[in-house]
Amino acid sequence: MKRVLTSVVLAPRNAAIAVIGLYRRIVSPLYGDVCRYYPSCSAYGLEAVQEHGLIRGGGLAVWRVCRCHPWAEGGIDDVPARQVQQYRRTRYGFVVAPSHGKG
């Protein structure tokens, strides 16, 4: 029961991860390497949502996109680290409970 509840709670986060992944594969290559920051804004957004969830990670991603403009200095801007890791990432980037897929 707990695994099902965890999967339901993580569904919006994983849906956002899928949308960002599609953007990175389809739209981002059309623009080329135009981001002034490292990692790129889409990579930052993906990691922020994976690490902090849809609300806080989405907020971090929006703030990052707002700071990325032609007059920005740019540079290295990593996603703030989370204190405690609650979930693990699959090889496809989706977030699952630590015990998901084991035993």
UniProtKB/Swiss-Prot annotation:
Stored InterPro entries: Membr_insert_effic_factor_YidD
GO cellular component: plasma membrane
Membrane topology category: Peripheral membrane protein
Main subcellular location of this protein, as a coarse class: membrane
Key words of the record: Cell membrane, Membrane
Subcellular location field: Cell membrane
Domain of life assignment: Bacteria
One Pfam entry name: YidD
Disulfide bond positions: none
Functional description taken from the UniProt entry: Could be involved in insertion of integral membrane proteins into the membrane.
Protein family (similarity comment): Belongs to the UPF0161 family.
Protein's name in the database: Putative membrane protein insertion efficiency factor
